[in-house]
Amino acid sequence: MQCALYDAGRCRSCQWITQSVNEQLSAKTADLHRLLAGLPVEQWRTPIGGPEQHFRNKAKMVVSGSVEKPLFGMLHRDGTPVDLCGCPLYPASFAPVFSALKPFIARAGLTPYNVARKRGELKYLLLTESQFDGGMMLRFVLRSETKLTQLRAALPWLRAQLPQLRVITANIQPVHMAIMEGETEIYLTDQHALAERFNDVPLWIRPQSFFQTNPTVASRLYATARDWVGQLPVRHMWDLFCGVGGFGLHCATPQMQLTGIEIAPEAIACARQSAAELGLTRLHFQALDSTQFATAQGETPDLVLVNPPRRGIGKPLCDYLAQIAPRFIIYSSCNAQTMAQDIRHLPNYRIQRVQLFDMFPHTAHYEVLTLLCRL
């Protein structure tokens, strides 16, 4: 993939960009083999790739510059701003949004936050696009609520320019630290969630719910999990760290009892909305800590699916799963190193199959799906 920002030395986020996609996949596969060395794997599935560019459904832009000439992108360690509007990872549909937002910031008087001076209001712009219908969600991350009245007053102009903006919010992040968002979310539109659809499964994206940034590969990941579960005798399933319910909603059948657990209430609201649309009455989603939920249960499901953050599921949950011994565990991971550590804490399981998903092209990162069967 060609990138003018990389060629000019202005951005190095895509550290593997000079390698071909095949070379990248080979290196990632070798890394996964190395991490699982000593753990017998019955079946290595062919890695799944996706588009080289224009695949991201989300932009996270630091806002710098002035209110008259804002700049969207990132800041180097020395404070030098870099305009990332031309990043080739973004779809072409993002360009007109960035173009309209620059004069809008002046209209609304949203002075970009100056890190060195600790002054200004607008810290970040967070933009998400639905692959289903092209609808978008835009979040203004502000230092305070000072400019909310001006922001609301200027919004009709922006919505006239960009009718694809379905969900608009102001997120309040008052701390002088490189934290992307705060706890307070103020909705500026009647619609609170962005509609998405993977493999004919309705999904919803809310401002403070995690959602995969590579929808092409994510849809194949969910479809693969559904295929694997469909081949197993599963009537009762837990979906831990479930997010908006992508895995559970794909895997569930009308006959299956499924409980999805996620600590973020916004994500659980999305999952419940999808389950209601699908008419799946035996799906139950709860906003709880996954480890605390699992270890408090007195029953053993047929299958436990885990999709933890990069830190993995950890030894306490591994020990509990080893104790209750569900027949199957499906582990989806964005950090194969912690996944391998966790699997080594499950000695009464064998790895039946492993498949790599290239969710993050041009970087060393990847997603991996692993099926574990009880010995």
Curated annotation (Swiss-Prot):
Binding site for [4Fe-4S] cluster: C3, C11, C14, C87
Pfam families, per database record: tRNA_U5-meth_tr (PF05958)
Keywords: 4Fe-4S, Iron, Iron-sulfur, Metal-binding, Methyltransferase, rRNA processing, S-adenosyl-L-methionine, Transferase
GO molecular function terms attached to this record: 4 iron, 4 sulfur cluster binding; iron ion binding; rRNA (uridine-C5-)-methyltransferase activity
Highest rank taxon of the organism: Bacteria
Enzyme category, top tier: transferase
Reaction(s) catalysed by this chain's protein: uridine(747) in 23S rRNA + S-adenosyl-L-methionine = 5-methyluridine(747) in 23S rRNA + S-adenosyl-L-homocysteine + H(+)
Function: Catalyzes the formation of 5-methyl-uridine at position 747 (m5U747) in 23S rRNA.
Ranges annotated as spanning the membrane: none
Name of this protein: 23S rRNA (uracil(747)-C(5))-methyltransferase RlmC
